[in-house]
């Protein structure tokens, strides 16, 4: 009877549920047939409406609707796909299959038929096997339910032995393999793609899931938990690529351009999966090498991209490539084909260089690291999780990923964050998105749709919630974001807007490079940086069309070195640009990237760098949660880490240069050495003392024997120009120029030389570039010596090198600048460096035989002719200031005869001489400050304040002298003191008067300079020392007028009027100093106590004792006076006793003070300006 009831019940249930799609027992019909001994007393599953409201559902098949839906007039629906249930209580494998043999046979036959049909379909479409949902080498097992869903096979992420897929000759044997071996693989730690509207399988139902096939015993535990060297896995790459098709964003190959290796990122990764990998900490190697190692790690098998999202990135990328092709010198738009070959350089890619073993610089600091202030945990579990992540996900393409991104004509640089980058951490942020969607969204959409669009920043969270207001959603989601950030399995970096970020001094932090496109970097450099100081000693056309056209494909060691060098040259240039960008109040240099959600409606922000609407809220939150000291330490920590990373990476490649010096192209050598110039420029730009970078730069320059090019006779640049446009063969059979044709195929492979450590003899027409680079390094050496008082490292004189190596013909391919007026501005900054080099080489402290008042008339005469024929610039005026300062020191120190021990008589002529020198010095200081205030008071790159384009007719050599002819007049007009009845001074200061001098000086408007902070320090030091001298001289003149005749009285009155004007200028200088803020990263206190100026006196008491009745205090605090007195006494015996001191007169007290000021000015020159 029971059997009869069971049969009747089963038949009725199967009849009832056979054609019903909304029945709750439809998903488990086969299993219910074997267990339905008694009828259910309640609904086995709540309808979607009751589940949403979280109320009890009493749905019954007889009614077809539950009471709640009937009351509300709704219809019961069961559209939501449920998750698989776990095993029941007391579940064991031995008793887990109470099914009948008939049902099992039925299911097995149905699954095999399904497999045969799919296998035939895949065999007919082998060309598109990488895009199919089920791989052809997948053997399904018995499904657990009749409505089982197809998940991507887990074995997609497990490399095969030798990359050969298993055969399917005997599927029955494979289906009967023991599935217990699968338990050895911790498959729940392997990420896989979740298809939308599909359920997850439980752990215990793995062997009944069709998404997992049984494995051969030889394939077990072949998943690499640690990234291996490309060399050890090289054999798996060739066979793997032969059988699998690459599904990525790779395009046709191209030639020309530069920095192509960055565009090769994502060649092997899925088009959607690699977007979330931007926050992964990876080895700081070129993406070209990472792609190769990734393909080897995965055994050459393609990864299955999520459906419905594959065609959009490819079409989007093709659109971007068409936009990038507008620039002839951009190789970002031309991806190279994948080459499976990898050489020994890959060992450096996977394991790092030998010099990096045990290095302080962390490998986590890489171009793929996020632009956030992060906290790197040293927990071994976290490290293991980072190493176990599959390497197929690549860094998204850089700045041009967002429509180019509609680059505005008014701004050449646009930081464009990819929307895919904002969707990073797809595996870890799904919970956050789901929670936010359920809390803030009013729609009933499945929240699993957001799992592939997870965002990591509050600004991006705001953009992902259309159902709520921006302010409210931003606030709520930031709270949820912060609450989830401490989970140990989350590898994403913590945003700087979070309140619980670690202390900056104890973390390894860096910025994410690649946010600015290559085109924008080059354009920004030549518009805002090159005119101020030529880091790259070459014009833009030759750089982009010749020098950067190098092969970076992994054909050999040399080409991989090329890729590595260009990568870190580019990163260093981007670091400079981002540090130099004008920041908002309270902003940071890495805030240009973090939390940026690009929106076309953000037109109210500054051109070039578009920020999200929540940017101000984030800044306010950060200011409220961190004090000023912590913010300063954070910025400094990130900057130092980024600078050290660039420096460490570029130094690591030097052993490869020494080993392959003969094969490395001179183009790469120029780029490599320019990177060191770039890093020294960054240090000078922010005013940071890091002598290690300069010292290592000098060492590497000496390794290349560049000093020989300056010391020994070499053909000048006029002899180098002929081979630029045509091939030249000399009559004496010398083929130095023809053996190495620029831009030819042999550029990457040079003939061997007898001296491997010296520059090759076949690069004579590149020698001018190496000479320029050596001169630039000597300039930075001199600048650091002047600023910090250290000894000069390069003692080779560069006097006259500006005219010899930089001011060449404009038509030459190797010219420095193609515009005549811009070239003159560049040469002025170089002449300033040349002067500082001569001053440091002739220091008194470094030359014991020299007297205090050493003569620099040769340098003055050399500079005077040059200064008078050039447009007005800050570098020109500062040269005049340095020369005037040394002349003033000589004048003051000559007032005291050290041998006789007496002061000179302060006559009217001597007083007039001192007053003229002092007034000229103060006038030049005011001119320097006013010009800085008008051109670029913050020394920042501001796209709303661009340099003007030079006149169209200026490049002609014939019109150059005529344009320069009026510059001395303009210089004289601007040099006139503003208080001497010159009403046009303030018009020129505000830019209202446009004469020749103003137009020429405006060519440097918006230009940044590495000398800005050093100039401001020196100007402040001189002003502090001489600001009270006019008052003292006026008092002396007023006292002396009673004993002078009428003619002398009139002359004294003129001097008093002139000194009164200087006092007025000192007041203006004090006010202008407060408006000039060129400081970046590091704050410089100009009014802090300076030992070299006051000998340990505090800033509050300095002014009180500056003019005492006796000058003993200042004289004793002079370091140089003490040093020279010791040298004098050690060389000579004391002669007669000193004369008895007389009652000091006013003139003698003033003379003592003047001499003391002279010694203090000498201390400033010898001991450093900072």
UniProtKB/Swiss-Prot annotation:
Region of interest (Disordered), ranges: 1-46, 77-149, 226-254, 269-288, 293-323, 384-506, 944-977
Composition-biased stretches (Low complexity): 113-138, 239-250, 293-302, 309-323, 385-397, 424-444
Compositional bias annotation for Basic residues: 473-488
InterPro entries per UniProt: Carb_Metab_Trans_Reg, Zn2-C6_fun-type_DNA-bd_sf, Zn2Cys6_DnaBD
PTM-bearing positions, type Phosphoserine: 202, 205, 208, 229, 283-284, 410, 414, 1130
Domain of life where this protein originates: Eukaryota
Processing after translation: Glucose-induced phosphorylation regulates the DNA-binding activity. Hyperphosphorylation in cells growing on high levels of glucose does prevents DNA-binding and dephosphorylation restores DNA-binding ability.
GO-annotated biological processes: glucose metabolic process; negative regulation of transcription by RNA polymerase II; positive regulation of transcription by RNA polymerase II
Any GO MF annotation of the entry: DNA-binding transcription repressor activity, RNA polymerase II-specific
CDD domains linked to this entry: GAL4 (cd00067)
Compositional bias per record (Basic and acidic residues), positions renumbered to this chain: 99-108, 271-280
Localization, UniProt: Nucleus; Cytoplasm
DNA-binding region ranges: 47-76
Pfam name, any one: Zn_clus
Sorted UniProt keywords: Activator, Cytoplasm, DNA-binding, Metal-binding, Nucleus, Phosphoprotein, Repressor, Transcription, Transcription regulation, Zinc
GO cellular component: cytoplasm; nucleus
Sequence ranges of Polar residues compositional bias: 1-22, 139-149, 411-422, 445-457, 493-506
Purpose of the protein: Glucose-responsive transcription factor that regulates expression of several glucose transporter (HXT) genes in response to glucose. In the absence of glucose, it functions as a transcriptional repressor, whereas high concentrations of glucose cause it to function as a transcriptional activator. In cells growing on low levels of glucose, has a neutral role, neither repressing nor activating transcription. Binds the consensus binding site sequence 5'-CGGANNA-3', of which multiple copies are present in all HXT promoters regulated by RGT1.
PANTHER family, sorted: GLUCOSE TRANSPORT TRANSCRIPTION REGULATOR RGT1-RELATED (PTHR31668:SF26), GLUCOSE TRANSPORT TRANSCRIPTION REGULATOR RGT1-RELATED-RELATED (PTHR31668)
Family under the similarity heading: Belongs to the EDS1/RGT1 family.
Protein name: Glucose transport transcription regulator RGT1
Organism for this UniProt entry: Saccharomyces cerevisiae (strain ATCC 204508 / S288c) (Baker's yeast)
């Amino acid at each position: 009877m029971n059997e009869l009831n069971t049969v009747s019940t089963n038949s009725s249930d199967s009849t009832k549920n056979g054609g019903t799609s909304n029945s709750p027992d439809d998903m488990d019909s086969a299993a219910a047939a074997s267990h339905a001994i008694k009828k259910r007393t309640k609904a086995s599953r709540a309808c979607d409406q009751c589940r949403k409201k979280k109320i009890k559902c009493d749905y019954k098949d007889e009614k077809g609707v539950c009471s709640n839906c009937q009351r509300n007039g709704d219809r019961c629906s069961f559209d939501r796909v449920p998750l698989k249930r776990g095993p029941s209580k007391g579940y064991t494998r031995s008793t887990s299959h109470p099914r009948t043999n008939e049902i099992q046979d039925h299911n097995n036959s149905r699954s095999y038929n399904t497999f045969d049909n799919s296998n035939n379909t895949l065999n007919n479409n082998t060309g598109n096997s990488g895009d199919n949902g089920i791989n052809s080498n997948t053997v399904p097992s018995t499904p657990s339910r009749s409505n089982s869903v197809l998940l991507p096979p887990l074995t997609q992420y497990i490399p095969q032995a030798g990359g050969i897929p298993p055969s399917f000759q005997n599927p029955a044997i494979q289906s009967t393999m023991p599935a217990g071996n699968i338990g050895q693989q911790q498959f729940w730690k392997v990420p896989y793609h979740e298809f939308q509207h599909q359920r997850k399988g439980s752990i215990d139902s793995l062997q009944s899931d069709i998404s997992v096939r049984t494995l051969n015993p030889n394939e077990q535990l072949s998943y690499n938990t640690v990234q291996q060297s490309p060399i050890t896995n090289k054999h798996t790459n060739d066979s793997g690529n032969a059988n699998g098709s690459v599904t990525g964003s790779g395009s046709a190959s191209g030639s020309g351009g530069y920095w192509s290796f960055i565009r090769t990122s994502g060649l092997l990764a899925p088009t959607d999966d690699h977007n979330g990998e931007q926050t992964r900490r990876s080895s700081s190697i070129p993406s070209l090498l990472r792609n190769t190692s990734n393909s080897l790690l995965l055994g050459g098998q393609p990864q299955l991209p999520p459906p419905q999202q594959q065609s959009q990135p490819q079409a989007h990328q093709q659109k971007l490539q068409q936009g990038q092709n507008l620039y002839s010198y951009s190789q970002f738009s031309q991806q190279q084909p994948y080459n499976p070959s990898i050489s020994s350089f890959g060992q450096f890619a996977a394991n790092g260089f030998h010099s990096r073993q045990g290095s302080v610089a962390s490998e986590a600091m890489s171009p793929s690291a996020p632009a956030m202030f992060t906290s790197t945990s040293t927990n071994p579990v976290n490290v293991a999780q980072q190493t176990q992540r599959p390497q197929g996900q690549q860094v998204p393409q850089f700045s041009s990923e967002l429509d180019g991104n509609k680059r505005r004509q008014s701004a050449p640089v646009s930081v464009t964050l990819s929307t895919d980058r904002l969707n990073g951490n797809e595996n870890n942020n799904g919970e956050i998105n789901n929670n936010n969607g359920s809390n803030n969204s009013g729609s009933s959409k499945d929240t699993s749709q957001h799992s592939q669009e997870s965002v990591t920043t509050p600004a991006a969270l705001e953009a992902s919630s259309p159902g709520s207001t921006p302010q409210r959603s931003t606030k709520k989601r930031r709270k949820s974001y912060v609450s989830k950030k401490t989970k140990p399995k989350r590898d994403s970096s913590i945003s700087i807007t979070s309140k619980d970020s670690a202390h900056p001094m104890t973390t390894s932090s860096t910025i994410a490079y690649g946010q600015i496109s290559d085109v924008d970097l080059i354009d920004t450099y030549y518009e805002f940086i090159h005119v101020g100081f030529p880091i790259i000693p070459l014009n833009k056309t030759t750089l982009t069309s010749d020098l950067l056209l190098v092969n970076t494909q992994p054909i050999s060691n040399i080409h991989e070195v090329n890729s590595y060098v260009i990568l870190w040259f580019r990163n260093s240039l981007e670091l400079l640009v981002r540090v130099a960008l004008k920041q908002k109040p309270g902003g940071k240099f890495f805030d240009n990237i973090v939390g940026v959600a690009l929106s076309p409606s953000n037109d109210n922000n500054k051109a070039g760098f578009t920020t999200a609407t929540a940017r101000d809220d984030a800044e306010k939150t950060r200011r409220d949660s961190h004090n000023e000291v912590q913010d300063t330490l954070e910025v400094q920590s990130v900057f130092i880490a980024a600078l050290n990373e660039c420096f460490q990476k570029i130094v690591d490649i030097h052993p490869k240069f020494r080993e392959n010096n003969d094969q490395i192209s001179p183009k790469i050598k120029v780029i490599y050495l320019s990177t060191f110039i770039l890093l020294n420029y960054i240090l000078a730009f922010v005013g940071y003392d890091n002598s290690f970078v300069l010292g290592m730069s000098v060492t590497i320059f000496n390794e290349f024997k560049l000093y020989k090019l300056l010391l020994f006779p070499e053909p000048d640049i006029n002899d180098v120009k002929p081979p630029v446009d045509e091939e030249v063969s000399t009559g004496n059979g010398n083929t130095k120029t023809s053996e190495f044709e620029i831009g030819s195929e042999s550029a990457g492979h040079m003939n061997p030389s007898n001296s491997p450590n010296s520059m090759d003899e076949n690069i004579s027409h590149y020698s001018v570039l190496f000479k320029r680079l050596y001169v630039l390094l000597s300039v930075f050496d001199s600048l650091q010596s002047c600023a910090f008082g250290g000894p000069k490292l390069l003692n080779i004189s560069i006097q006259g090198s500006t005219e010899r190596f930089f001011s060449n013909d404009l038509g030459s391919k190797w010219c420095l600048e193609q515009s005549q007026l811009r070239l003159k501005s560049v040469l002025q900054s170089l002449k300033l460096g040349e002067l500082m080099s001569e001053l440091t080489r002739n220091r008194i402290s470094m030359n014991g035989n020299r007297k205090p008042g050493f003569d620099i008339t040769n340098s003055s005469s050399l500079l005077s002719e040059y200064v008078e024929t050039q447009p007005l610039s800050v570098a020109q005026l500062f040269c005049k200031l340095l020369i005037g300062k040394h002349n003033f020191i000589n004048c003051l120190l000559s007032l005291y005869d050290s041998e006789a021990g007496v002061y000179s008589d302060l006559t009217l002529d001597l007083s007039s001489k001192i007053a003229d020198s002092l007034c000229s010095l103060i006038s030049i200081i005011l001119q320097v400050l006013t010009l800085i205030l008008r051109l670029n008071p913050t020394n920042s790159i501001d796209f709303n304040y661009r340099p003007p384009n030079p006149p169209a007719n200026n490049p002609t050599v014939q019109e150059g002298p005529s344009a320069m002819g009026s510059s001395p007049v303009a210089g004289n007009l601007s040099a006139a003191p503003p208080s001497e009845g010159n009403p046009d001074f303030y018009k020129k200061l505000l830019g209202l008067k446009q004469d020749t001098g103003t137009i020429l000086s405006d060519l440097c408007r918006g230009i940044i300079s590495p000398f800005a902070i050093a100039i401001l320090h020196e100007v402040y030091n001189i002003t502090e020392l001489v600001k009270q001298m006019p008052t003292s001289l006026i008092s002396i003149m007023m006292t002396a007028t009673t004993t002078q005749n009428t003619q002398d009285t009139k002359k004294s009155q003129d001097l008093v009027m002139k000194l009164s004007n200087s006092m007025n200028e000192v007041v203006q200088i004090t006010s202008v100093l407060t408006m000039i803020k060129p400081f970046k990263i590091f704050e410089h206190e100009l009014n802090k106590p300076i030992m070299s100026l006051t000998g340990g006196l505090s800033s509050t008491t300095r002014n009180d004792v500056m003019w005492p009745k006796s000058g003993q205090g200042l004289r004793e605090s002079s370091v140089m006076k003490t040093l020279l007195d010791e040298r004098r006494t050690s060389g000579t015996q004391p002669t007669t006793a000193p004369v008895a001191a007389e009652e000091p007169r006013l003139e003698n007290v003033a003379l003592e003070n003047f001499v003391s000021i002279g010694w203090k000015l000498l201390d400033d020159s010898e001991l450093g300006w900072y």
